[in-house]
Regions:
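Short hydrophobic/aromatic patch on the recognition helix
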Residues: 37-48
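Amphipathic alpha-helical linker/stalk segments
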Residues: 56-83, 120-131
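Short secondary-structure transition hinges
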Residues: 89, 93-126, 159, 163-167
Length: 188
C-alpha cells in the first residue's frame, strides 16, 4: 500500500488563499479546502481544531502578504501618496483578498483615533508632516482625508468593477493630496 500523502499546515493555508483569491473568504470551508488539496477533510482537522483556527491563520498570512506588498511600493519621498497608490494597486490586483481584508468588517470597532495611532500610520503621518510642513495635528487630518479618499477609490474599483488605469489613479491621488494639503493649510 503506497504511503498517504502528507498535508502540511502551509499546504492548507496555500489552498485557502487560492480559494480566497478566486472566490472570496466565504468559499473557504472544509469541503472546498479538501477538494482543492485533493484529500478528505480528515487531514485538515488533524492539524487544526476547527475552521475558525484555519481562518485565523489565513488572516495572518493575508496580512503578511498585504504588508509585504505595501512595503515594496511605499517610498519616503511622499509616503502618504505612495501608500494610497499602493493600496489602490493592491485592490486592483487582488480584489478578493482586498475585499477579505478591508471590506468584511475587519475594521469593525476601530475608531479614527485607533487608525491614526497605529504604528504603521504614525510613520506615514510623520512623513506627511515633513513633506508638507503641516503641524502633526494637521498631518493627522491630511492622513484621514487622504486615507478615506484612497479607500473610496479602491472600493469603487472592487465593488463596481470600475477600470481606472494606474496612471489615472496616480493623477487622482496627486490632485487629492495637493487639494487636501491646501485646504488644511488654509485652516492653520
Amino acid at each position: 500500500m503506497p504511503p498517504k500523502p502528507i498535508i502540511t499546515k502551509q499546504d492548507i493555508i496555500n489552498a485557502a488563499i487560492q480559494l480566497v483569491r478566486e472566490n472570496g473568504i466565504s468559499s473557504v470551508n472544509a469541503r472546498n479546502l479538501a477538494k482543492t488539496l485533493n484529500c478528505s477533510t480528515k487531514p485538515l482537522f488533524r492539524i487544526y481544531t476547527n475552521m475558525d483556527e484555519i481562518k485565523e491563520d489565513i488572516k495572518i498570512e493575508l496580512d503578511n502578504y498585504y504588508n509585504s506588498f505595501m512595503e515594496s511600493k511605499i517610498n519616503d519621498e511622499n509616503r502618504l501618496l505612495s501608500q494610497g497608490l499602493a493600496y489602490i494597486e493592491f485592490a486592483q490586483n487582488e480584489k478578493m483578498i482586498f475585499n477579505t481584508l478591508f471590506m468584511n468588517m475587519t475594521m469593525k470597532g476601530s475608531s479614527l483615533q485607533d487608525i491614526i495611532h497605529a504604528k504603521w500610520n504614525r510613520i506615514t503621518i510623520e512623513n506627511a508632516k515633513k513633506v508638507t510642513g503641516l503641524s502633526i495635528e494637521k498631518s493627522e487630518m491630511l492622513f484621514i482625508n487622504f486615507w478615506l479618499y484612497s479607500h473610496g477609490v479602491a472600493t469603487q474599483i472592487i465593488s463596481n468593477g470600475i477600470d481606472i488605469p494606474l496612471d489615472m489613479v496616480q493623477q487622482l491621488l496627486e490632485n487629492a493630496f495637493e487639494r487636501f494639503s491646501l485646504d488644511i493649510t488654509k485652516t492653520e
